[in-house]
């Protein structure tokens, strides 16, 4: 059990017969009336985000979540196949279980979340950044613009994003998995 003073981003709670993680919270002390906490909760079962207000001091049941690191092996018609790095146990997931499947490539590690009491699968979390290779992009011309211009690029997983003009084919770039946006070019040792 936890109270609203224990709220923090990422805390998993049981609420309305579902598991939620706190995405955002704000303690509010109005001039009139009691204090309360405004929250944004993300369902771990279906991914929907809801807004909810808790009165200050309310007791909430926290959910125990177990994180295990799995390695992505391959994708086929049955879904995505992952392997636990410690026990070598394999886990088969459908495409809906992974938030942005085009951000993962073979051999990449990701965290898989399980409910500790029941052992049920909850979801997958990608690392904050991934590095992917650009397979195709139009050549950018120097001096084409005075401002920061972007062009489309196709990555090795099939994902298409906007990249700066100086990015060429076969370069490796870093992508933010939360915003699915270009971050920087990865320096490669030659």
From Swiss-Prot:
Family per record: Belongs to the elongation factor P family.
GO BP field: peptide biosynthetic process
Gene Ontology terms for molecular function: translation elongation factor activity
Family matches, as InterPro entries: Elong-fact-P_C (IPR015365), NA-bd_OB-fold (IPR012340), Rib_uL2_dom2 (IPR014722), Transl_elong_fac_P/YeiP (IPR020599), Transl_elong_KOW-like (IPR013185), Transl_elong_P/YeiP_cen (IPR001059), Transl_elong_P/YeiP_CS (IPR013852), Transl_elongation_fac_P (IPR011768)
Pathway where this protein functions: Protein biosynthesis; polypeptide chain elongation
Organism: Amoebophilus asiaticus (strain 5a2)
Protein name in the entry: Elongation factor P
GO CC terms in record: cytoplasm
SMART domains named in the record: EFP, Elong-fact-P_C
Function summary: Involved in peptide bond synthesis. Stimulates efficient translation and peptide-bond synthesis on native or reconstituted 70S ribosomes in vitro. Probably functions indirectly by altering the affinity of the ribosome for aminoacyl-tRNA, thus increasing their reactivity as acceptors for peptidyl transferase.
Subcellular location: Cytoplasm
NCBIfam families in UniProt: efp, PRK00529.1
UniProt keyword terms in alphabetical order: Cytoplasm, Elongation factor, Protein biosynthesis
């Amino acid at each position: 059990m936890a109270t609203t003073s224990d709220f923090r981003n990422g805390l998993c709670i049981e609420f309305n017969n579902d598991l939620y993680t706190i995405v955002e919270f704000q303690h509010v002390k109005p001039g009139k009336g009691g204090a309360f906490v405004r929250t944004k909760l993300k369902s771990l079962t279906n991914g929907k985000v809801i807004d909810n207000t808790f009165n200050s001091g309310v007791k909430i049941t926290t959910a125990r979540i177990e994180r295990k690191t799995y390695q992505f092996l391959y994708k086929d018609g049955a879904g995505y196949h992952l392997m636990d790095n410690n026990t070598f146990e394999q886990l088969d997931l459908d495409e809906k279980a992974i938030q942005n499947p085009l951000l993962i490539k073979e051999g990449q590690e990701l965290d898989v979340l399980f409910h500790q009491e029941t052992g049920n699968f909850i979801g997958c979390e990608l690392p904050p950044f991934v590095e992917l290779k650009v397979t195709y992009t139009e050549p950018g011309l120097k001096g084409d613009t005075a401002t920061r211009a972007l062009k489309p690029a196709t990555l090795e997983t099939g994902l298409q994003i906007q990249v700066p003009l100086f990015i060429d084919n076969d370069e490796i770039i870093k992508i933010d998995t939360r915003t699915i946006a270009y971050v920087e070019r990865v320096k490669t040792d030659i």
